[in-house]
Every structure is written in structure tokens, then in C-alpha cells.
């Protein structure tokens, strides 16, 4: 097995399942954990564009199973080319587990 694939399989991670139709983006953050946990999930959405700024924050506590991707929420956003959008998802058990991931990745335009 490829070492990179093995490393990904052995580590907890947050990924984003994203689809786009025109300016409409559907973003589904998913978490895969190596151990089940009762975790605090925070989803922060920041947007800045010609019509102003907005910020939304969702927080919830979820019982997350191990070794399977779990969709945390579904976001549908109309993002015009001049908009700057950042979504940050954080999953923490308050002890040893703390994951955070941003969409879009910093290498993409935000």
C-alpha cells in the first residue's frame, strides 16, 4: 500500500465534498476519526463581497463513530467571482483530539 494512503488511513481528518453549478456551491464537510468520540463541532463561515460582510457560526456536540466518513452539515452558497469566502471546520473532544480544516484550501482563491 502506498505510504501516503496508509498515513491518511491512520489519521483523523476533515475533508470537503464540494460541487459547483455556476455560482452555486454545495459544500459538505466530512470528518473521519480513528477513534470514536463525543466531539464538539464548530463550523464558521465568513463571506465578504460587494454587498457587505457576513459571518455565521454553528456549534454542536456529536457522537462520532470511528473509521467512517460522517457528513457534518450541508452548506449551499451563491458565491460570485468577487466574493471572498472562508469556511473553517473544527472538531475537538476537549482533550487529545483537535482537528481544523479550511475551505477553500489556501492555495485556491478565497
Curated annotation (Swiss-Prot):
Residues 1-8 form the signal peptide. InterPro entries: Curli_assembly_CsgC/AgfC, Curli_production_prot_CsgC. It is found in: Periplasm. The keyword Lipid metabolism does not apply. It comes from the Bacteria. One of its GO terms (cellular component) is periplasmic space. Pfam families: Tafi-CsgC. Transmembrane segments: none annotated. Keywords: Chaperone, Periplasm, Signal. Plays a role in the extracellular assembly of CsgA into thin aggregative fimbriae (Tafi) fibers. Assembly may also require CsgE. Tafi are thought to be assembled via an extracellular nucleation-precipitation (ENP) pathway, and possibly also via an intracellular non-CsgC-dependent pathway. Belongs to the CsgC/AgfC family. This is Curli assembly protein CsgC. It comes from Escherichia coli O1:K1 / APEC. The lineage of its organism: Bacteria, Pseudomonadati, Pseudomonadota, Gammaproteobacteria, Enterobacterales. The gene is csgC.
